[in-house]
Curated annotation (Swiss-Prot):
Disulfide-linked positions: none
Protein name: Phosphoribosylaminoimidazole-succinocarboxamide synthase
Keywords on record: ATP-binding, Ligase, Nucleotide-binding, Purine biosynthesis
Gene Ontology molecular function terms on file: ATP binding; phosphoribosylaminoimidazolesuccinocarboxamide synthase activity
Pathway: Purine metabolism; IMP biosynthesis via de novo pathway; 5-amino-1-(5-phospho-D-ribosyl)imidazole-4-carboxamide from 5-amino-1-(5-phospho-D-ribosyl)imidazole-4-carboxylate: step 1/2
NCBIfam families: purC
This protein's encoding gene: purC
Organism: Clostridium botulinum (strain Hall / ATCC 3502 / NCTC 13319 / Type A)
InterPro entries tied to this protein: SAICAR_synt/ADE2_N, SAICAR_synt_PurC, SAICAR_synth, SAICAR_synthetase, SAICAR_synthetase_CS
Coiled coil: none
EC number: 6.3.2.6
Pfam family, one: SAICAR_synt
Length: 234
């Protein structure tokens, strides 16, 4: 496998072509952003930690029957992945009220929800990734009802697997977001699963071990990511 020119650079990762049209190299950066890029910073070694955390969690999910774009970890910052066409939606899964949902609905942060909540947002930076419903997504040509049904099924499997896994590590999986990609007629879990994309709270202390520490200027951001890596790597 030979790494070639850069295809795309996002907020947290760079994507490179390879000599195989069906694969890409994903490079994890140390850049941190919040509030749709309004807040910017750097977290030392974030890319190294998120690459490792994502690789381990994707391997776990593959073993549990969730198909992903992940092929292998190449080095401390890069992984080889299938070249998917990303569906321009984020699926957000919420087990405990926090963040924008708590604010939007006037709920106290930390309230356990009576059922898991599934939301979708339209991946569009210019519009600040607005929440939409299934009908919007289909009406504006982003996806189909059949594809959405499968996306929610993938999200539910990911939630069930990771909730149980993190619980064993003494962590509450509060909420998370995933992206899905199309590859040879299949839908695959793509992007990453890390403290950048999940809210992870210590079960005994309630301490936040995720990007909220950066968003809210709580300090000890690197230490929180290191703690998640340590627990995932047990």
């Amino acid at each position: 496998m030979e790494k070639k020119d850069m295809l795309y650079e996002g907020k947290a990762k760079k994507i490179f072509r390879t000599d195989d049209k069906d694969t890409v190299v994903v490079y994890y950066k140390d850049d941190a952003t919040a509030f749709n890029g309004e807040k910017k910073g750097t977290i030392e070694d974030k890319g190294v930690m998120n690459n490792s955390i994502t690789a381990m969690l994707f391997e776990l999910l593959e073993k549990k029957g969730v198909k992903t774009h992940f092929i292998e970890k190449i080095n401390e910052r890069e992984q080889l992945c299938k070249k998917v066409e990303i569906v321009p939606l984020e699926v957000i899964v919420r087990n405990i009220a926090a963040g924008s949902m708590a604010k939007r609905l006037g709920l106290s942060e930390g309230r356990k929800l009576d059922t898991t909540v599934f939301e979708i947002s339209y991946k569009n930076d210019d519009l600040n990734d607005p929440l939409i419903n299934d009908y919007h997504a289909v009406a504006i040509g982003l996806t189909t009802f059949e594809e959405l049904k499968e996306m929610y099924s993938i999200a539910e499997k990911v939630n069930n697997t990771l909730k149980e896994f993190f619980d064993e590590q003494g962590i509450n999986l509060v909420d998370f977001k995933i992206e899905i990609g199309r590859f040879n007629g299949e839908l695959l879990l793509a992007d990453e699963i890390s403290p950048d994309t999940c809210r992870l709270w210590d079960k005994s202390t309630g301490e936040k071990l995720d990007k909220d520490r950066f968003r809210r200027d709580m300090g000890n951001v690197k230490e929180a990511y290191m703690e998640i890596l340590k627990r995932v790597n047990k």
